[in-house]
């Protein structure tokens, strides 16, 4: 069983929900681009074999220039690929760049989420070896209602509602299979765990 993994780092979002005029991963936090807080964790982790950084094509050169300034050169295990029109298509592009799609393990993380550390990575890596599909989530604190046509249709039972976060981790072949199924059914989901759930595989 492999003790290593690859990671797809998603940075091709437009920052619409955040309300930013530019891609939020390019914003600086303590004089570092936001994406570097996650990128540095994976680059410094010897268990990580490859970082597939999914970026907007028009921002690729800018980010590569920043990375050179941060690390002296482009790290050997860092690969850039272009993002898609939706998160799902960006992850799909990242999956196509994996070195070991058959027997490896892959994590997916949002580059705009800086609060990641080695302990989180280790926890996921240990779990995915056994469970094949694992995610981080926190209990919902707000009451969630289903609304249709401006009218409340249902109030969800808060104790069973969890807010999903990243990183997430999967056996690479399992996540690829989930994406192939989604393509066949022309289904676009919210995040990776949802696609794996559609295979009736526990997450």
Predicted regions and their residues:
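N-terminal glycine-rich phosphate-binding loop and ensuing alpha1 helix
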Residues: 2-61
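Residues at secondary-structure transition points
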Residues: 21-24, 29, 33, 58, ...
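Conserved core of the sugar-phosphate nucleotidyltransferase
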Residues: 115-202
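Hydrophobic packing residues within well-ordered alpha-helices of enzyme cores
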Residues: 18, 63-67, 124
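Conserved N-terminal catalytic core of the sugar/cofactor nucleotidyltransferase
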Residues: 36-103
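Substrate/cofactor-recognition hotspot
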Residues: 110
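Short aromatic/hydrophobic "clamp" motif used to bind/position activated sugar donors
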Residues: 106-107
